[in-house]
Amino acid sequence: MALRRPMVAGNWKMNGSAQLAQELFNKFATKLQDDSVEVVLCPPSIYLESVRQLLDENKETLNGCLVRMGTQNLSQHDFGAYTGEISGQMLKDSGCRYVIIGHSERRRMYGETSNIVAEKFAAAQKHGLTPILCVGESGPAREARRTFEVIAEELDVVIEKNGTMAFDNAIIAYEPLWAVGTGKSATPEQAQEVHAFIRKRLSEVSPFIGENIRILYGGSVTPSNAADLFAQPDVDGGLIGGVSLNATEFLSLCTIAMSA
């Protein structure tokens, strides 16, 4: 069985502040003892420089702990007249290692199709960023028992454009739309069932990738349910929304992941 290092990624969405970043780093020094968990902060782009400075200033106090910087979106284009967009190269230059791709809010609110998501996935990897690819079904799709069908379709578009081996440098986040921001989380059994399906589907085309890719769960993860979720054999951590804005609770999730 592969040894997959747990990851806890905080998606601040359009929230947070430079003060929140400082509060998190103050707690990292006391709560994170080693590299057994990888922590990723994904603030709004305006705060990337603040987080980067804190990473530089706290190298010694972090003492080998894996705290990385990510972002919430990128353009599928390298450059050009795309007002308000940020390219993969710009994000790489800012110090980002990860980028969230295909979050349900981007798909729903901004009309990002699976083809656009696949293009953004490719753009991220072209510029040395690791995509965190979000997939997940709506409430009606789950009720119609179409969960696996929806997720397979979302994965297949990315595979068709980028090839299976592109997942050798990628993270997948299962975020059921009916659990994102609703306070209603998937049960550990529901999460495990879908994570196992994702791993099996990738294993069919590449056993190595299927075994080694990290699959996060996202959707109303809290300190009260994280231990049971993270204990599932195919759940490798979480993509965290609201709780990532509370330094104490977010660090609780990190420590839970360390012992999962």
UniProtKB/Swiss-Prot annotation:
Main location: cytoplasm
Taxonomic superkingdom: Bacteria
GO cellular component, one term: cytosol
GO terms classed as biological process: gluconeogenesis; glyceraldehyde-3-phosphate biosynthetic process; glycerol catabolic process; glycolytic process
Compartments, record wording: Cytoplasm
Catalytic reaction annotation: D-glyceraldehyde 3-phosphate = dihydroxyacetone phosphate
SUPFAM superfamilies tied to this protein: Triosephosphate isomerase (TIM)
Annotated InterPro entries: Aldolase_TIM, TIM_sf, TrioseP_Isoase_bac/euk, Triosephosphate_isomerase, Triosephosphate_isomerase_AS
GO MF term list: triose-phosphate isomerase activity
Keywords for this protein: Cytoplasm, Gluconeogenesis, Glycolysis, Isomerase
Pathways involved: Carbohydrate biosynthesis; gluconeogenesis; Carbohydrate degradation; glycolysis; D-glyceraldehyde 3-phosphate from glycerone phosphate: step 1/1
Binding site for substrate: 11-13, 181, 220, 241-242
PANTHER family for the chain: TRIOSEPHOSPHATE ISOMERASE (PTHR21139:SF42)
Protein family membership: Belongs to the triosephosphate isomerase family.
Function as written in the Swiss-Prot or TrEMBL entry: Involved in the gluconeogenesis. Catalyzes stereospecifically the conversion of dihydroxyacetone phosphate (DHAP) to D-glyceraldehyde-3-phosphate (G3P).
Quaternary context: Homodimer.
The protein's name in its UniProt record: Triosephosphate isomerase
Organism whose genome encodes this protein: Shewanella pealeana (strain ATCC 700345 / ANG-SQ1)
